[in-house]
Swiss-Prot record:
HAMAP family per the UniProt record, alphabetical: Arg_succ_synth_type1
Coiled-coil spans in chain: none
GO-annotated biological processes: argininosuccinate metabolic process; L-arginine biosynthetic process; urea cycle
Gene3D superfamilies: Argininosuccinate synthetase, chain A, domain 2, HUPs
Sequence positions that bind ATP: S6, Y7, S8, G9, G10, L11, D12, T13, T14, G113
Similarity comment text for this entry: Belongs to the argininosuccinate synthase family. Type 1 subfamily.
Protein name per the record: Argininosuccinate synthase
Location, primary (coarse class): cytoplasm
InterPro entries: Arginosuc_syn_C, Arginosuc_syn_N, Arginosuc_synth, Arginosuc_synth_CS, Arginosuc_synth_type_1_subfam, AS_cat/multimer_dom_body, Rossmann-like_a/b/a_fold
Oligomeric form and interacting partners: Homotetramer.
Compartments in which it is found: Cytoplasm
Pathway listed: Amino-acid biosynthesis; L-arginine biosynthesis; L-arginine from L-ornithine and carbamoyl phosphate: step 2/3
GO cellular component: cytoplasm
Amino acid sequence: MKVVLSYSGGLDTTVCIPLLKEKYGFDEVITVTVDIGQPEADIKQAEERGKKYADKHYTIDAKKEFVDSLFMLIKANGNYEGYVLGTALARPLIAEKVVEVAKKEGAEAVAHGCTGKGNDQLRFENIFRQHGFKVIAPVRELNLTREWEIEYARQHGIEVPATKEKPYSIDENLWSRSVEGGKLEDPSFEPPEDIYEWTASPEKAPDKPEIVKIDFEKGVPVALNDERMGGFELIKALNEIGGKHGVGRTDMIEDRVLGLKARENYEHPAATILITAHRDLENLVLSRRELKFKKFVEEEWAELVYYGLVNDPLFDALNAFIDKTQERVTGWVKVKLYKGSAVVVARNSPYALYSEELVSFDTESIDQRLAEGFAAFHGLQGRLFRRLFQ
């Protein structure tokens, strides 16, 4: 019997390889690592471990597909309770690639290394079950702890980066880096500086601010500092620039799908800069009613992504609405980066619904006296209510 395992090269998925044979009776374990912008060293390490411990290994390049999904996220100002959805958006894509290999190999089942307390189990399994595969989840089904896994790996000669002193679970892709576990599970514990890799400490960031200019076309970032580049290169460059200035750290309490509250630590410099810039450009070109309704759509969109429900028909409908709003979201935005902050300082668009002449205090383009009639009726119902009951 064959099983295809979604494989990151980390502790959880690595111990799943022998467990799938020992506890579940599979003859062949095939590992699949999906490249969505992780560091090259991580991809190489996963390949080496997959080839060493599994019977067969695949590495699939899905960076372009992931960037396309990130463009949609930017247009949706994707954000769940302050989380920029990097891991959540990646999981269904990874699951689809695992399914492709499972079909190719004629596997009887697919597997993942997610725990029974997190969200990823749901994101993976929704896609796996959509394609009719039997799902194996050793970490959840065997009720494993990270300490048990570390000891099991040691006994089986499996080399893993996690230790009992630093039992962190780290997930990284082009959009974000997340760190959880260990002492970080105590919400009163201040995270040590060594958990961060993408971002400088804001206190130690450069004393001189830096301004970046981002060009958008129909809601999609297409140029950085007047240089056109592909999405992958642009996001990677902003991660480096923003990280240098300590931009994009999030330490938050997050409401998981199962109802548990979890402490999460994220790094996402490019995401912070791009969403800040994109939202500001929308404020310039979209009408008040478009902006108001889009906020509701964005909340629903983010929740569907967070819950792993990107195959829900509502998700397609929300995307269609968002795409319609982006037809005029073209222009440029300048963002100042300084010691952890990303602040918009200038913006311009040929579709701006802003008139300097009309809004200026120093012009007579609008006869101010015309506002008198509007002012007489503004708040009328509230005034009538107060007269009746006071």
